[in-house]
Curated annotation (Swiss-Prot):
GO BP terms: carbohydrate derivative metabolic process
Record domain HTH rpiR-type: where: 2-78
Phylogenetic classification of the source organism: Bacteria, Bacillati, Bacillota, Clostridia, Thermoanaerobacterales
Keywords carried by this UniProt record: DNA-binding, Transcription, Transcription regulation
Pfam families per UniProt: HTH_6, SIS
Keyword Kinase included in the entry's annotation: no
DNA-binding region(s), chain positions: 38-57
Cited PANTHER family: GLUCOKINASE, HTH-TYPE TRANSCRIPTIONAL REGULATOR HEXR-RELATED
Name of this protein: Uncharacterized HTH-type transcriptional regulator TTE0211
Domain of life: Bacteria
Gene3D superfamilies tied to this protein: Glucose-6-phosphate isomerase like protein, domain 1, Winged helix-like DNA-binding domain superfamily/Winged helix DNA-binding domain
Entry keyword annotation includes Chaperone: no
InterPro entries: Homeodomain-like_sf (IPR009057), HTH_RpiR (IPR000281), RpiR-like (IPR047640), RpiR-like_SIS (IPR035472), SIS_dom (IPR001347), SIS_dom_sf (IPR046348), WH-like_DNA-bd_sf (IPR036388)
Length: 282
């Protein structure tokens, strides 16, 4: 079941001013909202009942009653969060606990917003691709490289591009049967959006991996995969979002491996054997 509070959080940047006001109140007062009528919530948000209903439909719900039920479910499933981000006073154990907690929350929230149908479509496209180009910069570039390492081990032709000029020169030469996979947590990285648009115009199937919501990258791609994470103020290399993205790549890798199971077993045995020769024996 989708975590409606996570959905509202991730869609916040795409809401209209009226919707943003409703979202802010819900996120700040989720327990209170479960006890309000639609009229009471409208008054609390200084808006109309019709606006509340439109908001519900914007986030994929049928109406206000469903919103209240899903908020109650989200609250029931919430685990206690460690208070605040990392501070200069935190000892080693506090840092260990907080990082583990941030990453766990990112994975749990991502599982809540992942769409099985879109995952299936993405896995099908990747399994049948003539070649795959992964595009990402900075922390998302690390995820693109990880994806290339995984899929190359099962004999799927793929390349990870972090250089923005190479992304464009790759994208423009793709064709039908190829896949371009753009990775950007914000979904607004100009170079990644341009590369995906270029690949799509060239005839390739395009996939995006970005935070939940209608970002420029999500609008440009054929297939959208979403992650969810709340980054702490003190962060190193977009930690939580990177973990969420890597989790989706792992899921896709297994889904593709299932589709090519007999071949994959042989490929993994081959790669394991050849790499074992590079290890130093004690």
């Amino acid at each position: 079941m989708t975590d409606v509070l996570a959905v509202i959080r991730e869609m916040s940047s795409s809401f209209t001013p009226s919707e943003a006001k409703i979202a802010k109140y819900i996120l700040e007062n989720p327990t209170v909202v479960t006890e309000l009528s639609v009229n009471e919530l409208a008054n609390a948000c200084d808006t109309s009942e019709a606006s509340i209903i439109r908001f519900c439909r914007t986030i994929g719900l049928k109406g206000f009653q469903e919103l209240k039920i899903k908020i109650a479910v989200s609250l029931a499933k919430q685990t206690r969060k460690l208070d605040g981000g990392i501070t200069s006073e935190d000892d080693v154990m506090a840092v260990i606990q907080k990082i583990a907690n941030f990453n766990k929350q990112a994975i749990d929230s991502t599982i809540a917003v992942l769409n099985a149908e879109e995952l299936t479509k993405a896995a099908e496209a990747l399994a049948n691709a003539n070649k795959i180009d992964f595009y990402g910069v900075a922390a998302s570039g690390v995820v693109a490289y990880d994806a290339m390492l995984k899929f190359s081990r099962i004999n799927i032709p793929c390349t990870a591009y972090q250089d923005t000029h190479l992304q464009l020169t790759s994208a423009v030469n793709l064709k039908k049967g190829d896949v371009a996979f753009g990775i950007s947590y914000s979904g607004a990285t100009k170079e990644i959006v341009e590369a995906i648009q270029t690949a799509k115009e060239a005839g390739a199937t395009t996939i995006s991996l970005t935070k939940y919501g209608q970002s420029p990258l999500a609008k440009a791609a054929d297939i959208n995969l979403f992650v969810s994470s709340e980054e702490a103020m003190f962060r190193a290399g977009a930690m939580a979002s990177r973990i969420a993205q890597l989790t989706v790549i792992d899921i896709l890798f297994i889904l593709v491996a299932q589709k090519k199971y007999n071949d994959v077993v042989r490929y993994l045995e081959n790669t394991s054997e050849v790499l074992s020769m590079r290890k130093i024996n004690n």
